[in-house]
Structure formats: structure tokens, C-alpha cells
UniProtKB/Swiss-Prot annotation:
Example GO biological process: sulfur compound biosynthetic process
Record-listed E.C. numbers: 2.2.1.1
Species annotation: Methanocaldococcus jannaschii (strain ATCC 43067 / DSM 2661 / JAL-1 / JCM 10045 / NBRC 100440)
Top-level class of the enzyme under EC nomenclature: transferase
Taxonomic path: Archaea, Methanobacteriati, Methanobacteriota, Methanomada group, Methanococci
Protein name: Putative transketolase N-terminal section
Sequence positions that bind Ca(2+): D149, N179
Length: 274
């Protein structure tokens, strides 16, 4: 969005986004803070640095599109859209409430949300369809999609991966939020993903591995992916920390889908204010 933003600017935005994630989930007493915090830096880098996207015209036809396939991380997307001015900040504090507009998972009723997601794998499949549609419409844009690593245990992910390679969708850039935890525990204990890099390569994708909290790596890798016009979709495996930024949430599977209590909320907000 803004090529003039520096890494320090993105880090500042990400810290504010994390603060708002924890606050909104805490006030709602419900939600998924862990995976929202691990995904924050990727979403911030896309919207504030990499995507052709204007908050003043969020539905411009040739815009870049972002799909949050791991829809339970909706608080991260909402907080970013709020920083862009697309969602009013006051709406964040009504998350999951009847009087509010923000649901627990992304809904197309929400400004800036491209498609409803939450049923694991379906957002990824929809992103493949979007990329194909943009190609057929001869649009010079990109579709970005963020998956969870536990999400990759779903069969629909691999059907979509096969289709993306078949249709040579090099306008599709996907991320896996590889925090190695899901609701029932470690991904490798629940259903091992094995060598996920080799798997996507076998499906015909170009694959990169990065630190998902390093803005320089995120930006440079996306720019490299965009430069490779070789008919292959791109997968970026981003190694992240679940609950990033809050000491007692980091690598703690309990906070996959649990809100902090009042005492924990106070501590978390203090940490994110430092």
C-alpha cells in the first residue's frame, strides 16, 4: 500500500494491532488470540507495504485480494482493517456481540472482507478460484491467502493446491502460518504434516521458507515471488510463534481458542504497551 513505510513503521503498526487483538478478544471473553497474534506481521506487511490496495476504494476491480483462510484469526484482520480506517475502532470492542457488526469469523457483510471463511480449507479453495477469475478477466493483480498449518490437514487444501498448479496461477501467493500448534495440541501429534515444503513442491508450487515475524524477509520473499512469472503458484511457509508478543500466550496451545481473563488481559495489555 505505502512503499515509503519503513520496517520500524510496520513494527509499530503490528504492535498496535496486537494490542487491539488482545483487547477485543478479552472484552468479548471469546475468540482465538494465539493464531491471530502469530499471523499479525504477515497481514500487516501485506496491507501496509505489499498489496495494491486502497482503503479509499477497497473494492476497486484490479485490487490485490487477501483471503484469511484460517478464519478463526479474524481479530487480526479486523484490527488491520481498523488501522486502515475501513472498520471503526469502536466496532472492535463489540466483537462477537449482538450489538456489534464483527463476527467470530470473517463475513462478507464486513467492509474489506473478500469472502466468508472459517470452515478450514474453503478459503484457500476460494482464493484459487479468485486467482483464476482474475486471470480470465485479464487483471494484472495478485491474490494472497493465509492458511493455518493445522488447516493443511484438510483434504480440500490439496485439491485446491492441485488445481492452482494445473491452471498455472502464478498470480496466487499463499502463506502458511507455521506456528506448529492447533486446538488439540502440536500439529505433528494430531496429524503430522511431514515435509510440507516437499509436498507443495510435488504439487507444482514454488515454495519459500521464512521467519514470519521478520518484516524484511516477508517483504523480500513476496517481491521475489511476484518476479517469478513461471506459471507456478507460490507458497511461503512462515515459521511463527503462536501468541506472539504476550509472554504467557507464546507457544501456549491453551490460547488457541481461549480469551484471557481480567488479570491476564491487564498483564497482556501492559506487555504490549511497553
Amino acid at each position: 500500500m505505502d512503499n515509503n513505510l519503513e520496517i520500524k513503521d510496520l513494527e509499530k503498526i503490528a504492535k498496535k494491532v496486537r494490542y487491539n487483538i488482545v483487547k477485543m478478544v478479552g472484552l468479548a471473553k471469546s475468540g482465538h488470540p494465539g493464531g491471530s497474534l502469530s499471523a499479525t506481521d504477515i497481514i500487516v506487511a501485506l496491507y501496509f507495504k505489499l498489496m495494491n490496495y486502497s482503503p479509499d476504494n477497497p473494492y476497486k476491480k484490479d485490487r490485490d485480494r487477501f483471503v484469511l483462510s484460517k478464519g478463526h484469526a479474524a481479530p487480526a484482520l479486523y484490527a488491520v482493517l481498523s488501522e486502515l480506517g475501513i472498520i471503526e475502532e469502536e466496532e472492535l470492542w463489540k466483537l462477537r456481540r449482538l450489538e456489534g457488526k464483527l463476527q467470530g469469523h470473517p463475513s462478507m457483510d464486513t467492509p474489506g472482507v473478500e469472502i466468508c471463511t472459517g470452515s478450514l480449507g474453503q478459503g484457500f479453495s476460494a482464493a484459487v478460484g479468485m486467482a483464476l477469475g482474475c486471470r480470465l478477466d485479464k487483471l494484472n493483480n495478485y491474490v494472497y491467502v493465509l492458511l493455518g498449518d493445522g488447516e493443511c490437514q484438510e483434504g480440500i487444501v490439496w485439491e485446491a493446491a492441485m488445481a492452482a498448479a494445473h491452471y498455472k496461477l502464478d498470480n496466487l501467493i499463499a502463506f502458511i502460518d507455521r506456528n506448529k500448534l492447533q486446538i488439540d495440541g502440536c500439529t505433528e501429534d494430531v496429524m503430522s504434516l511431514g515435509d510440507i515444503k516437499a509436498k507443495f513442491e510435488a504439487f507444482g508450487w514454488d515454495v519459500f521458507e521464512i521467519d514470519g515475524h521478520n518484516f524484511e524477509e516477508i517483504i523480500n520473499t513476496v517481491e521475489k515471488a511476484k518476479s517469478m512469472k513461471n506459471g507456478k503458484p507460490k507458497m511461503i511457509i512462515a515459521y511463527t510463534v503462536k501468541g506472539k508478543g504476550v509472554s504467557f500466550m507464546e507457544n501456549n496451545v491453551a490460547f488457541h481458542g481461549k480469551a484471557p481473563n481480567e488479570e491476564q488481559l491487564k498483564q497482556a495489555l501492559e506487555e504490549l504497551s511497553e
